[in-house]
């Protein structure tokens, strides 16, 4: 695996390229509001507490379901049906990603444990100022 990252003048990641596939992020302040990855396009909307609330994936809106700690535990379609479910251990290591859209939306949308951005390719969480390895609890 090869990975390259690009950061803006504020030190925030605006692009990652893994094995030749570029993912580009558009930021509003520190929040990712738009993302393209290969042929996928995602728009993100946030709640009053500045946590991810809605993702529009390739033109279709989905709602995030969060635990009290802010973990993204599910994604719902417009009818309230669960299309993706996530599970984590106590330190945020992914345990499962299931559902009818698990292999598409479930993998490409980045918000997971505590609402942090998860990189499927590296297994690391991007916390803006550092990366977090849930397998090592640091």
Model-derived segments and their meaning:
Residues 41-56, 104, 109-112:
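Short, positively charged
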Residues 8, 17, 26-28, 36, ...:
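Residue-level detector of conserved, well-ordered beta-strand and adjacent loop positions
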Residues 59-128, 134:
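A motif-centric feature for acidic-aromatic and gly/ser/thr-rich catalytic loops and repeats
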Residues 1, 15-20, 34-39, 54-59, ...:
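Beta-turn initiation residues at beta-strand->coil junctions
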Residues 3-12, 22-31, 42-51, 62-70, ...:
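Aromatic-rich beta-strand edge motifs centered on tyrosine
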Residues 32-36, 48-55, 117-125:
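Phosphate-binding glycine-rich loops and adjacent basic patches that engage nucleotide phosphates
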């Amino acid at each position: 695996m090869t990975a390259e990252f690009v950061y803006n003048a504020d030190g925030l990641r605006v692009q990652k390229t893994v094995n030749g596939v570029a993912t580009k992020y558009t930021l509003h302040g520190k929040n990712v509001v738009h993302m393209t990855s290969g042929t996928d396009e995602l728009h993100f909307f946030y709640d009053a507490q500045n946590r991810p609330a809605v993702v529009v994936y390739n033109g279709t809106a989905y709602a995030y379901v969060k635990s009290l700690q802010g973990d993204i535990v599910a994604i719902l379609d417009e009818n309230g049906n669960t299309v993706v479910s996530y599970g984590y251990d106590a330190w945020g290591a992914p345990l499962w990603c299931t559902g009818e859209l698990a292999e598409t939306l479930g993998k490409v949308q980045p918000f997971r444990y505590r609402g942090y951005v998860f990189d499927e390719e590296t297994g690391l969480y991007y916390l803006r100022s550092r990366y977090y390895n849930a397998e090592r609890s640091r």
